[in-house]
Design a protein with these regions (language model features):
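Charged, alpha-helix-forming regions
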Residues: 1-316
């Protein structure tokens, strides 16, 4: 009798366990069905949303050149300054620029050494579509910049990348207005010192519209840390045949501020001498208030000049 009770008890427990398992299974099935996207009756499977993002490729430029939006070179976004007392923080600062370009900047003020890094990042990124992650090591980037690879420069490089991420530009070049960071962000492996960074895809519209310019990288490297000469080199690289500029205007465009007029003129003339030394300028004419540079044209610039002369014989 006791054995029959024991068998009956085990049967009852087994049935209860089976009911519990089936209840759990039904509950799980209901949750999975509720998680599925709702399809309106009679309309079948829902179509995926239309893709509105447009893939924009970088234009191709030679390995020995560095490029960015021309508004960067035609403004004081990366001024010719040396910050010995720390960098000022700017709040929607209206920067000097040429006609047709307007830039407001918020963040720690940048300089030409920041532009060195930014141009190198764009060089790495330009092999891929905008928004694609670009990979590089701190060592390789420092070597490309001609800098030593000691601990101090690794720290310096990271500070520049953070500064480029943190600065916000509101930049208009003719009909295109971009607002955002120059670098979108990224990650770093602290063991290998390898980086992954992204460039904001919206910045691509300057390139798509043809509003970009490039410069000779070896010439820029030859200028070493001469901030004034580097800024002038970048600005003049957006011109085929630049006309006379007043010293005052040049000083504003490359960010030479808070200096005496006489010192500014002397600084600019020395910078023109440097541009002549590296072969960028064949010569220049400096007057009392203006300076006119004569550029050694690239083959593509020579073709452009010939084409304009053919179209407009009055230029001869």
């Amino acid at each position: 009798m006791d054995s029959e009770k024991t068998v009956g008890s085990w049967d009852l427990l087994a049935k209860m366990k089976d009911i519990e398992v089936r209840a759990i299974a039904r509950s799980k099935q209901r949750r999975e069905q509720q998680a599925l996207p709702f399809h309106a009756e009679g309309k079948g499977k829902q179509e995926p949303p239309e893709q509105t993002a447009q893939l924009i490729e970088f234009p191709k430029w030679p390995e020995d050149r560095r490029a960015t939006a021309q508004a960067v070179f035609r403004s004081a976004l990366f001024p010719a300054m040396n910050f010995k007392q720390g960098r000022p923080y700017l709040e929607r600062e209206h920067l000097w620029s040429v006609d047709g370009v307007e830039i407001f900047f918020t963040g720690k003020q940048l300089d030409q050494s920041d532009l060195d890094v930014y141009l190198e990042l764009l060089k790495i990124a330009h092999q891929h579509p905008f928004g694609t992650e670009c990979h590089f090591s701190a060592y390789s980037l420092l070597k490309a910049l001609g800098r030593a690879t000691g601990k101090a420069n690794y720290k310096w490089l990271h500070s520049v990348i953070i500064r480029l991420c943190g600065g916000i530009v509101d930049m208009t070049d003719h009909h295109i207005r971009y607002f955002g960071g120059l670098v979108n962000g990224g990650i770093k492996d602290e063991n290998t010192q390898n980086y992954v960074v992204r460039i904001n895809t919206d910045f691509a519209h300057f390139f798509k519209a043809g509003l970009w310019a490039s410069l000779d990288n070896q010439q820029r490297l030859d200028l070493k840390r001469n901030q004034t000469a580097k800024a002038l080199h970048a600005y003049y690289s957006t011109h085929v045949t630049p006309g006379p500029h007043t010293f005052e205007k040049l000083a504003g465009l490359i960010g030479l501020c808070n200096k005496k007029r006489r010192d500014i003129k002397a600084n600019l003339i020395k910078a023109h001498e440097e541009l002549k030394r590296i072969g960028f300028l064949s010569d220049y004419e400096a007057g009392e208030k203006t300076v006119k540079p004569m550029i050694n044209h690239t083959p593509s610039q020579n073709r452009y000049i010939v084409k304009k002369v053919v179209i407009n014989p009055a230029m001869k």
